[in-house]
Regions:
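Serine-dependent carboxylesterase/thioesterase catalytic core
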Residues: 1-116, 125-127, 151-163, 172
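Generic structural motif recognizing short loop/turn segments at the entrances and edges of beta-strands
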Residues: 92-96, 141, 178-183
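C-terminal helix/juxtamembrane-tail motif
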Residues: 166-194
């Protein structure tokens, strides 16, 4: 379908940006992989809390990975294991992997005035809200710090590199060097989250 859109609409391929949430994260990865095998590299894929169960720590052909596009950025917002009702993947799967609030449980999701259903999916869906806010806000940029762990980040042991810290969301840019680094940031518990 993407090939048809490219050929029939005159879309500017360099501006193509695929976005997937949960299981859809892996579907856009499959699309990117399929197009790459046909000689077309998708410029950017953003994945919002990619599904963890049945995908995490599996072969890269079965899930999103950095080879699926020129730039793959990932927001991990619900990385608890399925045993404790987490839906997202903790494993790094992109060029930039962002872990707001450590990636486990999002601020504001512990409120008692939400239904059980809302409680169960609150952290998982929060990645969508963060991404949407990164598009609509003119003053908020989710600056994230490279760090070995969330604990080190909270202890203030992480600094921005000389070129500055990357931002999470729509304005994310592919890093100049490919390193396996996690990026941490804090958010607010209510909208605006930044």
């Amino acid at each position: 379908m993407i090939e048809v859109i490219k050929n029939d609409t005159g879309i500017n391929w360099k501006k193509l940006h695929l976005i997937g949430f949960s299981i859809g994260s892996h579907l856009v990865g499959y699309a990117g992989r399929f197009l790459r095998l046909k000689g077309l590299l998708v410029p950017r894929i953003t994945v919002l809390d990619p599904a963890g169960p049945l995908f995490e720590y599996q072969h890269p052909d079965t899930r999103i990975d950095p080879t699926d596009a020129e730039f793959v950025d990932v927001i991990h917002s619900d990385t608890n294991t399925i045993i404790v009702l987490g839906f997202g993947a903790e494993q790094q799967m992109g060029h930039l992997d962002f872990y707001p609030n450590g990636g486990y449980f999002q601020k504001g999701c512990e409120k008692f005035d939400i239904s059980l259903k809302q409680y169960l999916v609150c952290s998982h869906y929060r990645s969508i809200r963060y991404f949407m806010e990164s598009i609509s806000s003119q003053s908020c940029f989710y600056e994230a710090y490279p760090c070995k762990s969330y604990e080190d980040f909270k202890a203030g042991k992480c600094l921005c590199p000389s070129e500055g810290c990357p931002v999470m969301g729509y304005h994310a840019k592919k890093p100049k060097t490919q390193q396996s680094i996690r990026y941490y940031l804090e958010t607010r518990d209510v909208f605006p989250y930044c």
